[in-house]
Amino acid sequence: MLFGVKDIALLEHGCKALEVDSYKSLMILGIPEDCNHEEFEEIIRLPLKPLGKFEVAGKAYLEEDKSKAAIIQLTEDINYAVVPREIKGKGGVWRVVYMPRKQDIEFLTKLNLFLQSEGRTVEDMARVLRQELCPPATGPRELPARKCSVPGLGEKPEAGATVQMDVVPPLDSSEKESKAGVGKRGKRKNKKNRRRHHASDKKL
């Protein structure tokens, strides 16, 4: 997590005033004025438990933020893998500030100087990175409904359109035979009619 110059400077200033090692300390910001000491210790107990033993070294009221800040002294070096970035506390989310690794200080110093020259803050950069790396998820798009009709003779169905046609059930054997018989009788009648026509022509 990246912190601004003000956050790091405030942590160093607090640790220097309390004579504690800044690389073995945390600073918690955003504590409301009406949060007493017992409530505060109960809230931070579980989130800071993975860091080992700790104690509250001191607190200060920040006029600019209208809230309190607390310096937490650890007995062991900061475990960067488990240190919380935020704590859900009374009145909202409390920010946790800690000193970055020593090899990262030079990089962060240059980064902060660059952001200042551009009129930007660390928060601005973090917001842009979140937008670029984690774009808002969009649900699956639904295709618009299309009306499909059976094409006429000589017409081709549109691409992607599904054509529903009524299926005529096949004829069984009895129906086939009956229709075949009707067809034969019809042919015989036609032959007889032709013969009659020929006979009448001869008489004339």
Curated annotation (Swiss-Prot):
Disulfide bond entries: none
Q: Where is this region: Disordered?
A: 135-204
Composition bias type Basic residues, residue spans: 182-204
InterPro entries (UniProt xref): PNMA, PNMA_N
Q: Which Pfam families match?
A: PNMA_N (PF20846)
What family is reported?
A: Belongs to the PNMA family.
Which PANTHER family would you find in this protein's record?
A: PARANEOPLASTIC ANTIGEN, PARANEOPLASTIC ANTIGEN-LIKE PROTEIN 8C
- Specify the protein name: Paraneoplastic antigen-like protein 8C
Name the source organism: Homo sapiens (Human)
